[in-house]
């Protein structure tokens, strides 16, 4: 069940029972709720925390406007997961080689492919090149770096990951988390700056400059919708190509590996035209997953906690949404100051993963309790599978 957060604007309905919400995040949510074009109310997921531009874990319905900073710069960031026919009994004694093999085919961090693999090249030419060129013709500054074709099938950094997991029946799953990489970042930054320029030129004063918007019917609105739609499609392809590469690596160990019908590829940072409460609106999910009735989604825990394949319950008050993970309990800086490498080693003892100072900001203790997050959204989703990580590749 949700609780109400009071605001001077539309109601804020928050699925946060038993989950802490920072005062700064509450303030940010109230700023969103006071915008003049919010439709009905703002929904807040239990993994909510302070974000850049808008609150992570918020679902924002708008009429006649889109806020580029609410979508953010990792446009189309999301998850993919597939179940295989392989079981835990067939795992090798050491999983280090499996992790290294995945790292050999998936560039991580800032890295790109030096030469795109066939899957990536096919995706670029068949699905993305024409749209890229159309955006480039109108906004050449976005496309100054020619990395987009070389970054399909690459992971990125931060909280992006590739994981090998086991479910409740000890079946092997592949799960990964990534978005639109450098090109999505440039599209986001470019249009966020444009929106701020337009609002300032109009003489409008905002409680938060990051909440600048494009009004529907303007050229910049249309250009943003075109560019953000392209980036969201690119992000989905990025996950598809990575999934294909990981499965190919696993087939070197298990030539008879097959995938089941249970496969999910879902965004959690995006904007889309949807119908809610009888009205067509622009719905921005900022760190939230669509959870229509019967629809499968993915809610990952941290790199040491369990994750969930869920089925949506189609809750209308949540705009048919659920959380996109556990949610950070503290900032990356705070995590680095608070936790030691020894803390991280203890928390990830059961996972074959990076165990160095470079990933302490992603240590499990930096995230909220995933069980509390799931309990808070029991009326949004039901759990179909529970996954535990055994291999984790981080950017």
Regions of interest found by a model, annotated:
Residues 69-134:
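A generic, well-ordered mixed alpha/beta core segment in the N-terminal half of proteins
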Residues 33:
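Beta-strand elements of modular eukaryotic interaction domains
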Residues 50-51, 78:
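N-terminal start-of-domain structural block
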Residues 2-28, 37-42, 52-56, 60, ...:
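Domain-length cofactor-binding catalytic modules of enzymes
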């Amino acid at each position: 069940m949700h609780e109400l957060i009071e605001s001077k604007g539309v109601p804020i309905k928050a699925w946060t029972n038993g989950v802490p919400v920072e005062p700064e995040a509450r303030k940010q949510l109230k700023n969103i709720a006071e915008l003049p074009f919010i439709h009905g109310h703002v929904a807040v997921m239990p993994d909510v925390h302070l974000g850049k531009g808008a609150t992570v874990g918020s679902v924002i319905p708008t009429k006649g406007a889109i806020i580029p900073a609410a979508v953010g710069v990792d446009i189309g960031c999301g998850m993919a997961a597939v179940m295989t026919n392989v079981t835990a009994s067939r795992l090798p004694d050491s999983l280090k080689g499996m992790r290294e093999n995945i790292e050999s085919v998936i560039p991580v961090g800032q890295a790109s492919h030096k030469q795109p693999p066939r899957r990536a090249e096919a995706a670029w030419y068949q699905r993305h090149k024409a749209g890229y060129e159309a955006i480039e013709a109108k906004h050449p500054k976005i496309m100054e770096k020619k990395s987009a074709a070389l970054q399909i099938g690459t992971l990125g950094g931060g909280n992006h990951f590739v994981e090998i997991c086991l479910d409740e029946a000890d079946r092997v799953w592949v799960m990964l988390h990534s978005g639109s990489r450098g090109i999505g970042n440039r599209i986001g930054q470019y249009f966020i700056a444009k929106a701020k320029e337009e609002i300032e030129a109009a003489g409008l004063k905002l409680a938060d400059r990051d909440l600048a918007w494009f009004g529907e019917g303007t050229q910049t609105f249309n250009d943003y919708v075109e560019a953000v739609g392209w980036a969201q499609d690119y992000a989905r392809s990025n996950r598809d190509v990575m999934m294909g590469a990981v499965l190919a690596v696993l087939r070197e160990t298990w030539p008879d590996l097959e995938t089941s019908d249970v496969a999910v590829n879902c965004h959690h940072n995006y904007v889309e035209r949807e119908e809610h409460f009888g009205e067509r609106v622009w719905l921005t999910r900022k760190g939230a997953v669509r959870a229509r009735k019967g629809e499968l989604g993915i809610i990952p825990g941290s790199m040491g906690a369990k994750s969930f394949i869920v089925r949506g319950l189609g809750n209308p008050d949540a705009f048919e949404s659920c959380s996109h993970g556990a949610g950070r309990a503290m900032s990356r800086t705070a995590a680095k100051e608070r936790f030691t490498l020894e803390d991280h080693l203890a928390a990830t003892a059961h996972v074959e993963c990076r165990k160095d100072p470079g990933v302490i900001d992603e240590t499990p203790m930096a995230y909220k309790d995933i069980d509390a997050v799931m309990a808070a959204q029991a009326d949004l989703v039901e759990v179909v599978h529970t996954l535990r990580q055994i291999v984790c590749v981080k950017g």
